[in-house]
C-alpha cells in the first residue's frame, strides 16, 4: 500500500545535528526525491527533528517509527508519545522494534501483546501500517509465518550479511506481499564502496534501503541511485567482493547464537557498538551506551562458550577485547 522511494532516510545520525541543520538536511532529502523517513523512539531526539523538519511536507512523506513495545499497553503509550513528537495525527508505519529472541516474539504476538495493541491503534487511525524489525532473519521469518497483520519487515542485509536466512526472509516477504526495509546496508558503515554496495542491494528485489545520512553529499549520491537503477557490471561486482572478503573473517552477523553469555555480557550489542564507534556521527553515542552497560567485555571469564556456539567460528573473545579498546579510547 505504501509507495516508497527505493532509497529512504535512516534517522539515527541526525541526532548529532542541531535542529536547524536537521531541518535543512531533511528538506534537501525531500527535494532529492526521498519520501521514506525512518526513525525510532530510541534514536534520541530524531523523532522530534523529523516532526519539525517534515511538518510542512507531511503529505509528501512516509513517516516510519518504532519502539520496543512488547505489550498492548506499551504500544498504546508509545504511539501516543510518538504522534506528539512527530507532530502528526497519524503515523504511516509503526514497527515493533528489535525483536531478537523467541520469547520476545511470543510475547509480542500473544493476546495482550504489542501486535494486538498496534492493531487497535490502527483501527483508531493513529497508525496506518504495522511492521516488525530485528537482526535475526530466522526469527523474523517465523514472525511473518505466524501473523498476517505484519505488513513490513526491517532487517540487516548487505553483501556480507547475505546468508540463507536473509534470502529465505526476502522470499517469504515477497510471497506474502510484505514490504522489505533494509537497514545496515553498509554493515554499520564498515563496508567500503558505498555506491556499489547500495546498487548491489537494489538488484536483490528489496523495497527500500535506509542508509543513515548526515551530509548533503550523501543525500545527492544515495538519491541518485534511485534515478538510474543499473546493475553492477562483472568488474564492479568483482571489485566489491574483493573489498569485503577480508572483512568476512571476523564480521559479526548478529545471529545471536553466541548468547546468552553465562556472565550476562551483551555480546552482539558490544560488537555492534564497536563497529559503529568508527563512524564520527555516532561515536559519542556509542561510547555513552557502552559506558552505561551493567556488564561489558571486561567481565569476560574466557570460558569460550560463545565461540563454541558461533556458527561462523569467530574469535569472539579477542573481538570483544578489541571492541572494548575502541569504545574506551579517547
Pin down the residues of each PLM region.
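Conserved residues at the C-terminal ends of beta-strands
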Residues: 10, 40, 94-97, 133, ...
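Glycine/proline-rich, positively charged
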Residues: 17-20, 31, 72-181, 186
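Conserved, mostly hydrophobic/aromatic
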Residues: 9, 37, 50, 63, ...
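Structured C-terminal cap/extension of enzyme domains
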Residues: 30, 34-35, 168-182, 186-330
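Short catalytic-loop micro-motif centered on adjacent basic/acidic residues
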Residues: 35-40, 64-65, 128-132, 153-155, ...
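N-terminal binding-site loop/beta-alpha segment at the start of enzyme catalytic domains
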Residues: 1-61
Amino acid at each position: 500500500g505504501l509507495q516508497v522511494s527505493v532509497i529512504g532516510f535512516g534517522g539515527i545520525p541526525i541526532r548529532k545535528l542541531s535542529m536547524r541543520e536537521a531541518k535543512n538536511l531533511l528538506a534537501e532529502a525531500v527535494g532529492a526525491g526521498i519520501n521514506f523517513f525512518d526513525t525510532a523512539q530510541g534514536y534520541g531526539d530524531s523523532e522530534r527533528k523529523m516532526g519539525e523538519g517534515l511538518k510542512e511536507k507531511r503529505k509528501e512523506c512516509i513517516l516510519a517509527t518504532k519502539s520496543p513495545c512488547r505489550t498492548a499497553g506499551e504500544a498504546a503509550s508509545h504511539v501516543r508519545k510518538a504522534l506528539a513528537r512527530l507532530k502528526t495525527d497519524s503515523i504511516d508505519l509503526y514497527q515493533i522494534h528489535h525483536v531478537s529472541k523467541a520469547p520476545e516474539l511470543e510475547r509480542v504476538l500473544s493476546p495482550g501483546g504489542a501486535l494486538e495493541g498496534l492493531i487497535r491503534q490502527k483501527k483508531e487511525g493513529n497508525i496506518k501500517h504495522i511492521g516488525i524489525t530485528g537482526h535475526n532473519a530466522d526469527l523474523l521469518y517465523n514472525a511473518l509465518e505466524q501473523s498476517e497483520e505484519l505488513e513490513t519487515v526491517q532487517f540487516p542485509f548487505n553483501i556480507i550479511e547475505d546468508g540463507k536466512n536473509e534470502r529465505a526472509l526476502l522470499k517469504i516477504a515477497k510471497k506474502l506481499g510484505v514490504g522489505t526495509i533494509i537497514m545496515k546496508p553498509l554493515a554499520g558503515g564498515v563496508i567500503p564502496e558505498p555506491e556499489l554496495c547500495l546498487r548491489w542491494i537494489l538488484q536483490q528485489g528489496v523495497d527500500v534501503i535506509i542508509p543513515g545520512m548526515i551530509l548533503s553529499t550523501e543525500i545527492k549520491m544515495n538519491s541518485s541511485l534511485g534515478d538510474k537503477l543499473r546493475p553492477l557490471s562483472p568488474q564492479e561486482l568483482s571489485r566489491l567482493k574483493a573489498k569485503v572478503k577480508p572483512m568476512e573473517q571476523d564480521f559479526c552477523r548478529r545471529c545471536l547464537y553466541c548468547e546468552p553469555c553465562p556472565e550476562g555480557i551483551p555480546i552482539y550489542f558490544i560488537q555492534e557498538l564497536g563497529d559503529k564507534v568508527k563512524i564520527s556521527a555516532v561515536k559519542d553515542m556509542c561510547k555513552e551506551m557502552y559506558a552505561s552497560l551493567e556488564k561489558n567485555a571486561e567481565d569476560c571469564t574466557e570460558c569460550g562458550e560463545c565461540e563454541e556456539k558461533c556458527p561462523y567460528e569467530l574469535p569472539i573473545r579477542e573481538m570483544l577485547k578489541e571492541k572494548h579498546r575502541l569504545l574506551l579510547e579517547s
